[in-house]
A protein has these predicted regions:
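Short, low-complexity interaction segments enriched in Ser/Thr/Pro/Gly
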Residues: 2-5, 18, 39, 52-54, ...
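Polyanion-binding surface elements
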Residues: 1-29
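Intrinsic-disorder/low-complexity regions
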Residues: 8, 12, 31, 62-65, ...
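Major-groove DNA-recognition helix of helix-turn-helix-type DNA-binding domains
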Residues: 20-50
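A short, Lys/Arg-enriched interface patch at domain edges and termini
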Residues: 53-74
Length: 74
């Protein structure tokens, strides 16, 4: 898997793993602007999501990201 820092958009399921929450929690949090890790935009009837590496890092800390990356490469 590519390092999170190199990703333009962190996948919902990765953010959910990092925060120990469900993907639905992440989606709703972004839709309601409760999670300061990215944005959600409604396009017609579907939502699109952007999770920023920098915003996620600022929210949970680099140590948690490093721990996650080490875990998935074992």
């Amino acid at each position: 898997m590519e390092k999170l820092k190199g990703m333009k958009n962190i996948p919902i399921n990765v953010a959910a793993d990092l925060l120990n929450k469900s993907p639905q929690f992440i989606r709703i949090g972004l839709q309601n602007q409760r999670l300061p890790i990215g944005s959600a935009v409604k396009m017609s009837s579907q939502w699109t999501y952007h999770i920023s590496y920098e915003m996620l890092k600022n929210y949970i800390g680099i140590d948690r990201i490093n721990e996650y990356e080490n875990k998935i490469t074992e």
